[in-house]
């Protein structure tokens, strides 16, 4: 009788574990096709939508003269990467589109990134080499996020979201990349989503 009870408990535990694993399936919240692009990163390398395909990537909008949300957003992205590194997750990239491309040359972007403790700089692509009007239109068409030059200052208004793009160039998730309370930035969720996506699709 005791053996039967023990086997029943073991079976119930196994079913519970398998159910939990089944719930881990990646679920896309969006299906937004990213527009083609080909730009220059902080290392002077050409980066295109096609060159990024095959791996998922995390994207955001920043600029180096930003005096408000960009520094904490960039820091938050380094925290995401730190947790990915600890988990041994390697099959991804990080892409930051400059929303002030006339100021943000590759050299300026490279210097900007040195202000942060970046676990793996090789996965970061800070992009520039296009016009202000281009990035304003691109942001709306590809990510449904606002980018708008402020004519009364040297600042640029832009979305504070991080976005997850799948291996085929489709935006599938968005997250708050900035919050007044840093604990409200869903770093663990981003890491979990990316890990689940990679496990199921690569």
Question: Regions from the language model: what does each represent?
Answer:
Residues 1-8:
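Bacterial N-terminal signal peptides that target proteins for export
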Residues 23-51, 72-76:
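N-terminal "domain-start" segment that seeds a small globular fold
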Residues 48-71, 77:
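Short active-site neighborhood of thiol/selenol oxidoreductases, capturing the structured segment around
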Residues 75-138:
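Structural microenvironment flanking redox-active thiols in thiol-disulfide oxidoreductases
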Residues 124, 136, 143-148, 156-163:
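Structural micro-motif
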């Amino acid at each position: 009788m005791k053996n039967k009870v023990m086997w029943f408990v073991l079976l119930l535990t196994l079913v519970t574990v398998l159910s939990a694993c089944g719930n881990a399936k990646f679920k896309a919240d969006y299906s937004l096709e990213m527009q083609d692009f080909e730009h220059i990163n902080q290392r002077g390398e050409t980066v295109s939508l096609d060159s990024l395909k095959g791996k998922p990537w995390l994207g955001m909008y920043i600029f180096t003269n930003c005096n408000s949300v960009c520094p904490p957003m960039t820091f938050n992205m380094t925290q995401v990467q730190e947790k990915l590194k600890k988990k041994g997750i390697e099959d991804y990239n990080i892409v930051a589109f400059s929303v002030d491309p006339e100021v943000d040359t590759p050299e300026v972007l490279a210097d900007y990134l040195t202000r942060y403790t970046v676990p793996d700089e090789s996965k970061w692509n800070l992009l520039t080499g296009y016009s202000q009007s281009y990035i304003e239109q691109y942001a709306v068409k590809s990510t449904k996020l606002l980018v708008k030059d402020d004519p009364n200052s040297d600042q640029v208004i832009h979305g504070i979201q991080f976005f997850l793009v799948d291996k085929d160039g489709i935006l599938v998730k968005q997250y708050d990349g900035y919050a007044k309370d840093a604990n409200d930035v869903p770093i663990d969720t981003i890491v979990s989503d990316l890990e689940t996506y990679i496990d199921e699709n690569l």
